[in-house]
């Protein structure tokens, strides 16, 4: 059986971009904030498109006429998949849509925290999760010459160049970044996979070596328990949080203790948002023509401004150039300041939503072209390994 999406009623989260691919399918559309999407709001809706702040479960969907529900996000921890399937609905997500953006966020965080030099000099990076984001981050780091160790019991085959280890071993590395998907499925449930015991292991490992440690969570807040986070905040670890236990609420004492914080925007580049919409459009098209509506692969993003002229510092060495390039493209200082400007008493859900809605989405730089005033072979090499293209003024003469 086929359906015509333009003949159906849609309800769409107000932050989902109406890209040309998605707009071409839309019929009668209602737009509203994600937290305002209720059972009453969807009672006469056929297609429901949400983001991560809207729980989609039997309580929401039962009694509605929803036929298709999609999330424009990579993660599906806000979906009760069993309940959706039990109701006989078709659903889809956008895995990988935000991967490039999160990779860029983590790389710039290494520069902002002054850990970039250490990892380029041999300090290993431990990754928890090697899916769409973790796998791409590992590949990028390896191209830069960084030693990468990872834990992910669900990845097969194992990616070349990544040291395979158990969770406890990965958590003993000086730099740790979380990228596991959040789920409760046995035997490798990831919710609170880092509890207070694991955090204490991290602190003990840090105490046995010179220097501190860097912990980044740009994945899901509930991958760790509140107690585990508190253990780290009370230690010498430098903590960077884009997401945290109990999100969206952020207690004032946590805000006072964390080193760097941003309001869950690591994956929110302009291109990531567009990819999410385009992937949903592809799934809706397949569903409407009677095909399986499994999530599609990330599509090519819309054109964005060239980076030419934004990276012309060639007087320094390649390592200094790399550091400066990443600092120039970091959103972390700006976002940390925005969060703290809301008040050190902490954040409410309304505060959190306001910060995200006013986020100035950056353009991704991966795959873009930069211009060097004078072509330097070492800088060209490190830029290429970072993931950008290089041109020089001498090529235009």
Task: Please describe what each predicted stretch is.
Residues 7, 121-124, 196, 212:
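Phosphate-coordination loops involved in phosphoryl transfer and adenosine-cofactor binding
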Residues 1-45:
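N-terminal glycine-/charge-rich "phosphate-binding" loop or analogous flexible N-terminal tail
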Residues 46-118:
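Phosphate/diphosphate ligand-binding glycine-rich loop within oxidoreductases
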Residues 42-43, 61-63, 169-173, 255:
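A short, aliphatic-rich alpha-helical micro-motif
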Residues 14, 95, 103, 121-142:
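Glycine-rich adenosine-cofactor-binding loop
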Residues 205, 212-390:
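Rossmann-like dinucleotide-binding domain for NAD(H)/NADP(H)
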Residues 56-57, 155-252:
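Rossmann-like adenosine-cofactor binding region
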Residues 143-160:
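NAD(P)-binding Rossmann-fold cofactor-contacting core
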